[in-house]
């Protein structure tokens, strides 16, 4: 299983990174791409902010269209939630000297990827480098 971090999912949704697009297209048919519930929340939070901060009807119209596009994009992936195995990893990362300082959203994404023994694809490799056992690759740079 391959989990896409929020930065990669966002890039993929824009289809503007040729290296990433080619890497995704070259995957075996049996490879499963997934997004965590955290990535879904982060992507939709950004769209909600644009809707709430729209200064006029044109901005609101564009913000609503982008929100709907993002929703359509998100449903094309399997969704991974925090399960019992993820909770165990979460507890462990909270106790780690280096990992307890991680952003909470990154920590939760790492926990979900670990629980599913998944490869995490991210541009933010440094954010996850201290998570023992987490497989990380950058397909965009």
Where are these regions (language model features)?
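Acidic, PIN/NYN-like endoribonuclease modules and their adjacent C-terminal/linker elements
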Residues: 1, 110, 114-141
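Short, well-structured N-terminal submotif of metal-dependent ribonuclease cores
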Residues: 1-38, 49-68
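Generic structural signal for small/hydrophobic residues in well-ordered secondary structure
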Residues: 5-6, 43, 90, 113, ...
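Alpha-helix capping/helix-boundary segments
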Residues: 8, 39, 86, 109, ...
């Amino acid at each position: 299983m391959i989990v896409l971090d929020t930065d990669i999912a966002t890039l993929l949704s824009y289809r503007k990174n040729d290296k990433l697009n080619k890497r995704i297209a070259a995957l075996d048919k049996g490879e499963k791409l997934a997004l965590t519930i955290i990535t879904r929340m982060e992507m939709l939070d950004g769209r909600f902010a644009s809707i709430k901060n729209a200064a006029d009807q044109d901005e609101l119209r564009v913000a609503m269209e982008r929100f709907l596009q993002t929703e359509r994009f998100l449903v094309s992936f399997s969704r991974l939630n925090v399960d019992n195995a993820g909770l165990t990893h979460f507890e462990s990362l909270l106790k780690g000297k280096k990992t307890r300082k991680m952003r909470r959203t990154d920590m939760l994404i790492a926990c979900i990827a670990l629980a599913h023994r998944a490869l995490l694809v991210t541009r933010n490799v440094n954010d996850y480098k201290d998570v023992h056992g987490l497989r990380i690759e950058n397909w965009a740079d």
